């Protein structure tokens, strides 16, 4: 087996950034170490596992505990150069025998959440340990038990000290996962600044809202626009999608999994990009087109001598302020164009779309 202590970064534009490991990979390695110690009395350190795509990382143990009828092992999560809130958290697995014929049971220990709402991959009442980490732990436990001629009847409790506090920085409270973080991962590898985890959470948020029968959801580009929309609707937490810059992540998923009504709320600059047709609103992946803003302003009645000032403006907000200074409304037309982009992306899905444009203070500039 190859000793791969750091996952390869296959994105040449981010070759200098270091990848890391998911909580699911850490939990699997900790479980392997704990079960091995439970059977043999010895902890493998480092402990290697095989990830779904064949990588073979080795993990140093940060914690070992062996008692009467149980074993515990802990690994400090290394997320590489990704700004992951779980980076540095200790993932602890406690393993002990279960009654004959029970199979493998997963439990949430300190700092690991419990699912309370329908719509997620794990049913309510279960530990928030996602399917792939469950499968990885199950397969490795079954293989170890088979090697020693033992039945794989085990209780695996995953704990993360401080996880309840960490979870407040995640989507878990809105998804109805209480008490801590989730044990996640589909490949075992964390890619720095990957969009996939964020978009996955948006999808799970839509799933939860649909399962709850919610007919109206809100996607906002930030907290200011979210607060402005919530002042109008006071939607339940699980109806608020953490859209951020990923308008496309919301709209494309709703295309296949519709909800009756979607409100998109955002600042003027972000929604100008949506009006232009951009679905990723991040500043590094889409830019405001001043020529587009001039066309909007011209149609709204802006005089010709304003064209150069708009084209040379530093920001979208500067353009907005210029037009406001002469009583020209461009926020309304931007909202209409943004709505057209959303409807085009939905491709006829039965979703009613509302757009709310706000300024930096949260004042509503347009609502269509």
From Swiss-Prot:
Keyword set, alphabetical order: Cobalamin biosynthesis, Methyltransferase, S-adenosyl-L-methionine, Transferase
Catalysed reactions listed for this entry: Co-precorrin-5B + S-adenosyl-L-methionine = Co-precorrin-6A + S-adenosyl-L-homocysteine
GO biological process per UniProt: anaerobic cobalamin biosynthetic process; methylation
Database matches in InterPro entries: CbiD, CbiD_sf
GO molecular function annotations of the record: cobalt-precorrin-5B C1-methyltransferase activity
Signal peptide region: none
Pathway involvement of the protein, from the record: Cofactor biosynthesis; adenosylcobalamin biosynthesis; cob(II)yrinate a,c-diamide from sirohydrochlorin (anaerobic route): step 6/10
EC identifiers of the protein: 2.1.1.195
Record HAMAP family: CbiD
Similarity comment text for this entry: Belongs to the CbiD family.
Name of this protein: Cobalt-precorrin-5B C(1)-methyltransferase
Lineage: Bacteria, Pseudomonadati, Pseudomonadota, Alphaproteobacteria, Hyphomicrobiales
């Amino acid at each position: 087996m190859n000793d791969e202590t750091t996952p390869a970064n296959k994105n040449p534009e981010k070759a200098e950034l270091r990848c890391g490991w998911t909580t699911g990979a850490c939990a699997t390695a900790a479980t392997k170490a704990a079960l091995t110690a439970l059977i043999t009395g010895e902890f493998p350190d480092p402990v290697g596992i095989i990830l779904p795509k064949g990588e073979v990382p080795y993990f140093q143990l940060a914690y070992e505990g062996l008692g009467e009828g149980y074993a515990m092992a802990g690994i400090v999560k290394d997320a590489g150069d990704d700004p992951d809130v779980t980076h540095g958290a200790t993932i602890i697995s406690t393993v002990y025998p279960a009654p004959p014929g029970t199979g493998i049971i997963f439990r949430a220990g300190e700092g690991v959440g419990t699912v309370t709402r329908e719509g997620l991959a794990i049913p309510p009442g279960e530990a928030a340990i996602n399917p792939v980490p469950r499968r990885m732990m199950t397969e490795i436990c079954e293989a170890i038990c088979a090697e020693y001629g033992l039945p794989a009847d085990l209780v695996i409790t995953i704990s993360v000290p401080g996880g309840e506090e960490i979870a407040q920085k995640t989507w878990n409270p809105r998804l109805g996962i209480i008490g801590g973080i989730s044990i996640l991962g589909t490949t075992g590898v964390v890619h720095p600044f990957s969009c996939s985890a964020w978009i996955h959470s948006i999808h799970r948020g839509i799933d939860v809202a649909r399962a709850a029968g919610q007919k109206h959801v809100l996607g906002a580009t930030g907290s200011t626009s979210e607060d402005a929309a919530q002042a109008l609707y006071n939607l339940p937490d699980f109806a608020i999608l953490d859209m951020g810059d990923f308008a496309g992540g919301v709209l494309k998923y709703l295309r296949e999994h519709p909800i009756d009504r979607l409100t998109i709320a955002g600042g003027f600059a972000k929604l100008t990009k949506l009006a232009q047709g951009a679905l990723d609103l991040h500043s590094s992946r889409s830019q405001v087109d001043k020529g587009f803003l001039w066309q909007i302003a011209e149609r709204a009645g802006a005089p010709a001598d304003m064209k150069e000032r708009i084209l040379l403006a530093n920001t979208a907000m500067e353009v907005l302020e210029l037009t406001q200074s002469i009583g020209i409304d461009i926020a309304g037309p931007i909202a209409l164009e943004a709505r057209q982009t959303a409807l085009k992306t939905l491709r006829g899905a039965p979703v009613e779309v509302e757009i709310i444009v706000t300024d930096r203070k949260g004042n509503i500039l347009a609502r269509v």
